[in-house]
């Protein structure tokens, strides 16, 4: 079984302590993708798909509700981002949402990807790097999605 390395708390939910304790002692495989691939994946999964979910629930208020959802999510990490980074990313996010509202999808997508890239480089990547340095002794494999899938397909569960 492969699981994403998570903290015990995930939003308002939490992983059972015994399960999380076992996860924290288990070997790790690192999925390594380019920055652009990660930006594209996050855009598709968290922006495009989430917006479609908002539209399917209530089309007339989807833009406003989705905008509030994104801006509130960013606000929750404002203190950790720092004032300047927060304001810069928030400004780009608001521009992206406005372009989407005006049906300028190409510009909206480019702006969303711009703030996603800044958030990855300025916040998430340094945080993950710090966490992975603490867990480096447990890492048994690193590779791209294709490499990782190939490696995993040849594993003998008794060896891991």
Question: Model regions: which residues?
Answer:
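Conserved nucleotide-sensing/catalytic segment adjacent to the nucleotide-binding pocket
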Residues: 1-16
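Conserved NTP phosphate-binding and transfer environment spanning the P-loop NTPase/kinase superfamily
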Residues: 21-160
